[in-house]
Amino acid sequence: MTKLLYITAHPLDELGSNSMAAGKTFVDSYKENHPSDEVKHIDLFNEDIPMIDKDVLTGWGKLRNGDELTSEEQQKVNRLSEILDEFLEADKYVFVSPMWNLSFPPVLKAYIDAISIAGKTFKYTAEGPQGLLTDKKVLHIQSRGGYYTEGPAAEVESGDRYLRNIMTFLGVPSYETIIIEGHNAEPEKTEEIKAASIAEAKELAKTF
């Protein structure tokens, strides 16, 4: 059975967020067009996503040396392993995020750190790092109040660019986007911009 992870990094729901509205439309259409697939929603703002901190680094070091971990170290290391295992079990990933300060919310970076693990999602070879997620698909749905796809602002856009780069690093061969932008720059076009993203999400879900 094909499994899709719907990974949202937004504190608002579809009523308050253009990206979440497009994401919900995508998931509804995907379920309709792929009834035998499993879809799981991971709401990063309501999940325990440990930061890679001193406890984690120390815990990983103790595991390599066969030493005993503290309860705090063990709890965080175990949780990170659960996150990674769940990610690896899936076949497709849909990330939903807003643009915050030219990037995306920090909870998404914490999640990416949790799944970017040497020996699991990539490996080191004599020729350099090699991604291991060679049979996966990714979609990123991101909303931006201004215009960052083209023009001078494109150079400072760091959210979708980073996600695309890290997924390529991990070996993902298929990366697609639904970019919703300009609704703050041109508020009179807000409904038009939102409607276009909803239509795009519904259509893309049919073949994703």
Curated annotation (Swiss-Prot):
Q: Where on this chain does FMN bind?
A: 17-19, 99-102, 143-146
Q: What is its EC number?
A: 1.6.5.-, 1.7.1.17
Q: Which Pfam families match?
A: Flavodoxin_2 (PF02525)
Q: Which domain of life is it from?
A: Bacteria
Ordered alphabetically, the record's keywords are: Flavoprotein, FMN, NAD, Oxidoreductase
Q: How does it assemble?
A: Homodimer.
PANTHER family registered for this protein in UniProt: FMN-DEPENDENT NADH-AZOREDUCTASE 1, FMN-DEPENDENT NADH:QUINONE OXIDOREDUCTASE
Name of the protein this chain belongs to: FMN-dependent NADH:quinone oxidoreductase
Source species, please?
A: Staphylococcus haemolyticus (strain JCSC1435)
Q: Which gene encodes it?
A: azoR
